[in-house]
A protein has these predicted regions:
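Fungal secretory targeting signals
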Residues: 1-18
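Alpha/beta-hydrolase-fold serine-hydrolase catalytic core, especially in secreted/extracellular enzymes
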Residues: 18-105, 111-116, 280, 288-290, ...
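Structural recognition of the beta-strand scaffold that forms the well-ordered cores
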Residues: 120-123, 136-141, 197-199, 219-224, ...
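Cap/lid segment of the alpha/beta-hydrolase catalytic domain
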Residues: 123-187, 227-237
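Flexible loop/turn segments at secondary-structure boundaries
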Residues: 129, 145-147, 205-208, 228-233, ...
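Extended catalytic-interface subdomain
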Residues: 178, 199-201, 223, 261-298, ...
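Primarily recognizes the serine-hydrolase "nucleophile elbow" in alpha/beta-hydrolase
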Residues: 179-244, 269-271
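Mobile cap/lid helix-loop segments that gate and shape the active-site cleft of serine hydrolases
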Residues: 220-281, 304-312, 318-324
Length: 389
């Protein structure tokens, strides 16, 4: 049921990177008691539960470190040298590090009815949802970064070496970060780097979610039908599979795909031992506050509709604690065309684009599903939303 409940607040301020240099790093060995429920995003590994909003940046950094260590591999910082050149609609980005050089090119499609500098959406591969004529499209061939047909192949590894532990998902997020670097360096591209979104569908829906979680300069993420590692949680997917419905699980996803670090395979048969789940990736959008609209499909069991709903609901609890619940939307609609876009989901897509990219005073308190599954949040969440001062 579509709900527009909370009072409308002002638009997000421009994203400003947070200084996490004084935050503790992860210990070399982590002891975490097996937990079948979703871990508490407000409970750091070695500290009491959060009581203030000012404590969140270090917990956020800890979650990012956990995701990189256990699942995605390390995302390097900006390379020591980065340049950009614009030729027509092609923006070429060249990165140099430790004597190695790599270049990749994205394609710009500028708005037909707007004033520069324009907001833009980075589309993994190609956009599979409608982008309005007032917003630019940046087409990003993310699979150039990391090939699907062999680990350690692709432009990212040309720069950082074939043995780098990053999987394909985090290499693509690194590329998104570099695209924004290039936009900042290239005013002639006519793109406003402070109003950039990201989208993708299916495996690229996972990628878009991960990019927004790791790149604070992304103003809006629009992941579409990404299933687990985008909307859904590994713990819930395992239970769905155990109950007889075929769904994408952690155990399955590491077989043949190079999207994740090789370290993830150590944990896929013991998911309750992970000190995180994907609801905590959603929480990374909460501060600095950025838009996240998860677009999902209840007609495809493999996407794990129940997991997607429960996981996202748990993730939104972090937004609620930080006072930005309406920045995170969820829309789940039944249709048979994977990566198609039903008209029923257009109102929420329009609302999120208007608010986070076009600067309009639009209500984005959207949380809806046409799923008939039982909604029992206590089955997965044994913690509450803290009152953070």
């Amino acid at each position: 049921m579509l709900s527009f409940i909370l009072p409308l607040l002002l638009l997000a301020s421009p994203v400003i990177g947070q200084n996490t240099s004084t935050c503790p790093t992860l210990p070399s060995a982590i002891t975490y008691a097996s937990n079948a429920k979703l871990p508490d995003p407000f409970l750091p590994l070695a500290s009491p539960r959060l009581t203030t909003k000012s404590q969140w940046p270090c917990r956020k950094e800890e979650i990012r470190q956990l995701l990189q260590r256990y699942t995605y591999g390390q995302m390097p910082p900006k390379p020591s040298s980065l340049t950009a050149s614009l030729s027509g609609t092609s923006l070429t980005i060249t990165a140099k590090e430790a004597g190695k050089t790599m270049s990749f090119t994205v394609t710009l499609k500028l708005p037909t009815s707007a004033t520069a500098p324009y907001p833009a959406i980075i589309a993994y591969g190609a956009a599979s949802l409608p982008i309005p004529s007032t917003v630019a499209t940046i087409t990003y061939q993310n699979f150039e970064m990391a090939a699907d047909n062999g680990r350690g192949k692709g432009k990212f590894y040309d720069l950082y070496g074939a043995n780098h532990n990053a999987g394909g998902m985090i290499t693509a997020a690194w590329g998104v970060d570099r695209i924004i670097d290039a936009l900042e360096l290239t005013p002639a591209a006519k793109i406003d780097p402070k109003r950039v979104g990201v989208t993708g569908c299916s495996r690229n829906g996972k990628g878009a979610t991960i990019a927004g979680a790791f790149v604070d300069r992304i103003a809006l993420a629009l992941p579409q039908e990404g299933g687990q590692a985008a909307a859904g949680c590994w713990r819930i997917a395992d239970e769905i599979q155990k109950n007889g419905t075929k769904v994408e699980t952690a155990h399955q996803i590491v077989n043949g795909d190079t999207w994740f670090s090789t370290d993830f395979s150590k944990y896929v048969d013991a998911v309750p031992t992970l000190p995180w789940d994907n609801h905590m990736m959603h929480a990374l959008y909460a501060d600095p506050p950025r838009g996240l609209l998860i677009i999902e499909n209840t007609a495809i069991d493999y996407l794990g509709p129940t997991s997607n709903y429960h996981c996202a609901t748990a993730g939104r609890m972090a937004h609620e604690a930080l006072g930005v619940k309406h920045y995170f939307g969820f829309s789940q609609n039944s249709h048979s065309d994977h990566c198609g876009f039903p008209k029923a989901q257009q109102p929420e897509l329009t609302a999120f684009i208007e608010r986070f990219l076009l600067g309009k005073d639009t209500n984005t308190d959207v949380w809806k599903t046409d799923g008939k599954f039982v909604i029992d949040e206590k089955r997965w969440v044994d913690w509450s939303v803290p009152a953070l001062s």
